[in-house]
Amino acid sequence: MSKQPSPHKMIRDSSEFIHFEDRASDHPFVEKVWRCHSDRADKFLSVAANSFEMALTRLAGRTFLTLRGPETSSTLMDCPAEGEWVCIRFKPGTFMRGFLPGGLRDHHDVTLPPASGRSFWLKGSALDYPSFDNAETFVKHLVKSGIVTRDPIVEDTLLRSPRNLSLRSAQRHFLQSTGVTYATFRQIERARYATILLREEVSILDVVSRLGIFRPGPPHAIP
């Protein structure tokens, strides 16, 4: 089965057959909002990613919303022709109750049941599909309803200012709320940054230097 593309994961020249744009968000739980459409069917490389996402798909007369978790490795995927997508990418540590990122990891996506052409079922209620322009309003409703939440310990850990927790407790919080370990999270971030640099034709030696690939991590890093 082909997987619909997540725009921020495109690493080939998307101008060939996929056109997309993104924007920043002022919502504290949202990292970015994306949308794209495809002119024809082709393949794309879905690179490793740490994010939890909600992706709205319009394809062949159908509309549906899919929940996606982190991807720990890159995968060559099929992109269908004449599809449209809107994607909400959440900040690390944000998750939906009942659909933890670990359960969605590595293409174990969950498509929520449609209620109509404009809405879907979630927790017994029919909700309108989000759009590129009203994504924040959609997320605010989910947060207010207690459906989407965020673990502040994840942000503290990434900022290297963990709360008064044992190492084991911090590790448990991080894994549960992101779906990956801290070490895996950092590896994925470095790989994604390296991909961006290589696309910008930065030399391999400069990429290695910028990423500090051979530099040992600090002794207090969470494994």
Summary of predicted features, one role per range:
Residues 168-169, 189:
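A generic alpha-helix surface/boundary motif
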Residues 170, 218-222:
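Short hydrophobic/aromatic patch on the recognition helix
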Residues 186-196:
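Short, basic, alpha-helical segments at the C-terminal edge of helix-turn-helix-like DNA-binding modules
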Residues 1-167, 177-182, 196-217:
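Alpha-helical bundle regulatory/interaction domains
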